[in-house]
Amino acid sequence: HTQKTVCLNSATAAMEMVLHLLGIGPGDEVIVPAYTYTASASVVTHVGATIVMVDSQKDCVEMDYEQLVEAITEKTKVIVPVDLAGICADVDKIKEIITRPEILSKFTPANDIQDKIGRIVISNDCAHSFGASRHGKMAGEIADFSSFSFHAVKNFTTAEGGALTWNLCFGQDKVERQQVYCNSPIPFIEGETWNEFLYRLSQLFSLHGQNKDALAKTKIGVWEYDI
């Protein structure tokens, strides 16, 4: 459903990569739902931007879209809707909001990429929705960017891993350069050789995801674990 995709070591890495690709940093605001896993918000602090949380609807875990409108300012660069338990967030509603004339007039690009896009970007946390769909569209082809998780507890797993898909102007080469190394303001502990900003999915986990026997064994293991 989309040819623009790259495999990474986690959905967290994918979401952070999006912010780096867009040049998000200090002075920028990223809107996330209050009901979410920590990664959706923590990646915002990784790049030095400001988290703006929007509360859930009264009878639904999705963000309140009236509050979302109120939360958008001239500093807002990205909105991160979160899919939960296989249910896709209403990205179409968010698209309708961010393309309203009064919202478009607020958008203030900070670099050439943001200027080319010309509006707030939707970066969808799809860690829970691999294989899900909404109104005939698959998760991964709805938002500008979609981040997937292949963690051991997900419905498709490589033990550890993730992927990023996108529907914007970026070419594969630009994303793959980010995949190799991504600068971050977070300091590492002196003496450590491990670097969490090497975003590549390991070859072992990649092969696990491509091997039907390995996938079959994983499904059996998940079944036994659930029992």
What do the predicted segments below correspond to?
Residues 210-227:
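PAS/LOV and related PAS-like sensory modules
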Residues 20-129, 133:
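PLP-dependent aminotransferase-like
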Residues 1-10, 35:
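Conserved N-terminal alpha-helix of the aminotransferase class I/II PLP-enzyme fold
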Residues 6, 29-31, 221:
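Conserved beta-strand elements of the Class I
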Residues 14-19, 162:
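Buried hydrophobic packing segments
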